């Protein structure tokens, strides 16, 4: 394989989490198009009850549940809720806000159930992705990870805290490191007190383990994998994420900070790896971010040296090649792989 040129930016999409855990026992993490199919396979802690409720809502809109993508349905709820606020019906309105709330909790639960071995266990055991581990081991100081995923597959796949840690590695300071999940992570990864992260993990849509933001720091959840009921009722947990709607407020912190840093790093990296990310047509903000990166790099003749693409869908890879062609210049190299597993094997050759 051609020698990797650093600094590297890696973009992990939902397909990377799916591919990384696909051969691990249990239900795999979803991609957009099969989210509701995956949700319908989950058991325990009131999740089937919530899934049934959400699927009934989906059926009411489309007269089917199969083939309805998560983003399609969420955007439908979001836009109808907005219409209902200013163009009120003379008849009995639907409670679109309730439907959004139910779906957001189901999203959280699906990503918990599919990334741990047993949600019923006293101590939750997260699944490990050997594929992610191999990829992360190739990174060097000043490389950057960008993801639109909420799950913690990347965090759990670091073999140690040598390159990255959860205290300062998210591109923002965090609090809550002495409790629960964060305490366990730091211990398992043999974190040395005071050691700084050498790479950043920019989670542009938020994370399962983020509880709140106070203007300067993100508070980590002590139990990000918690799914439970209380007195027979489904327990809803608050997390800091941007739901998959059209109105993502990336212009507000902490997301504003992450998107700004992502753009700066994409504009100066030598190598870009896009793994399991399909750049859906509905994600206009991501389209604009990448289009602006291509425009500025082409205008400065600051071309990418290497572009790595891993996705089973050939049309997805072609879409990225077409998008990045102006930023590759006459000598940029493009490498295509069927999936993240093939990619993780080839980068060691």
Q: Where are these predicted regions, by residue range?
A:
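Gly/serine-rich nucleotide phosphate-binding loop at the start of the catalytic core
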Residues: 1-166, 343
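A Trp-anchored, charged/polar loop motif used as the substrate-binding/catalytic surface
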Residues: 124-131, 178-189, 245-264
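Carbohydrate-associated surface elements
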Residues: 207
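A short secondary-structure junction signal
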Residues: 156-159, 212-221, 284-287
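SIR2/sirtuin-family catalytic core signature
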Residues: 1-20, 29-33, 45-46, 248-349
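Acidic, metal/cofactor-coordinating or nucleic-acid-engaging core segments within structured domains
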Residues: 48, 52-54, 213-267
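A short alpha->loop->secondary-structure connector
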Residues: 161-175, 276
């Amino acid at each position: 394989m051609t020698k990797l040129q650093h600094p590297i930016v890696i973009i992990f999409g939902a397909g990377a989490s799916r591919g990384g855990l696909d051969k691990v026992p249990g239900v795999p993490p979803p991609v957009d198009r099969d989210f509701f199919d995956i949700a319908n396979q989950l058991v325990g802690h009131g999740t089937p009850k919530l899934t049934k409720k959400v699927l009934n809502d989906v059926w009411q809109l489309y007269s089917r549940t199969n083939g309805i993508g998560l983003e399609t349905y969420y955007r439908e709820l979001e836009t109808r809720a907005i219409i209902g606020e200013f163009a009120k019906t003379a008849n009995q309105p639907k409670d679109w806000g309730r439907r959004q709330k139910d779906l957001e909790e189901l999203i959280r639960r699906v990503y918990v159930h599919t990334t741990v071995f047993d949600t019923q266990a006293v101590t939750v055991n997260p699944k490990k992705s050997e594929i992610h581990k191999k990829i992360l081991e190739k990174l060097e100081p000043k490389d950057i990870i960008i993801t639109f995923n909420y799950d913690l597959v990347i965090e759990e796949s670091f073999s140690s805290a040598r390159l990255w840690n959860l205290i300062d590695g998210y591109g923002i300071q965090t609090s809550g490191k002495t409790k629960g999940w964060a305490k366990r992570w730091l211990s398992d990864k043999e974190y040395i007190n005071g050691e700084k992260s050498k790479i950043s993990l920019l989670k542009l849509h938020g994370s399962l383990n983020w509880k709140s933001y106070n203007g300067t720091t993100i508070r980590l959840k002590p139990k990000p994998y918690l799914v439970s009921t209380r007195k027979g009722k489904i327990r809803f947990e608050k997390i800091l994420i941007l739901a998959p709607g059209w109105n993502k407020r990336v212009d507000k912190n902490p997301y504003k900070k992450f998107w700004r840093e992502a753009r700066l790093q994409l504009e100066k990296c030598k190598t870009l790896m896009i793994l399991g990310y399909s750049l859906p047509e509905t994600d206009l903000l991501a389209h604009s971010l990448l289009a602006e990166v291509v425009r500025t790099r082409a205008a400065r003749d600051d071309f990418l040296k290497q572009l790595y693409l891993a996705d089973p869908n050939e049309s997805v890879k072609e879409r990225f090649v077409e998008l990045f062609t102006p930023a590759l210049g006459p000598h940029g190299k493009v490498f295509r792989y069927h999936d993240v597993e093939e990619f993780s094997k080839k980068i060691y050759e």
